[in-house]
Amino acid sequence: MAISPISLWQRLSYRSGSLNCQFYPSCSNYGAQSIAQHGVILGSALAADRIARCNPMAYHYHIKAKEPLFHNDGRLLNHVPIKLFSDTKGEKSPALASVLSIVAPGLGRVYANRTWDGLFGLLTVATMANLTYKSHTNNSSTGTVIFGGLTATFYLGEIIGAYQAAVEANNRP
């Protein structure tokens, strides 16, 4: 049930070359794998994080990694993490990055030097929150539940994504 929207998106997106994903696995496959490995709540948040990172600056951020990996077809290689939270030492605090994204979605990514990811994350959460508010004010309980769930998912994705962005910042050369 949780991957039904992913299957629907794949049926639509795989028909158009203009919707090819710059990542391997594709964002939709990453989402399905995340849900399978980490459950519906955390897996959906990881998928939301990936969607926020799938922006025009993704390649720029990827090549700054300690060991940027590419799939044999040239796409950016980024597998679902086995362990979500890990100990790390360095200049950027993953805990602080997460707290900053709790205060303001996207701020933790900006702190971790991923400004565009933070901006896309903020815009996504703000858009979903606005749609939730509009659904609520229009007395649409279905819309409120759907958009409220999406807002919560992307908000949690921002918190987890900020943590991981700080870990990655500490692993850069």
Language model segments and positions:
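Hydrophobic alpha-helical membrane segments
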Residues: 1-173
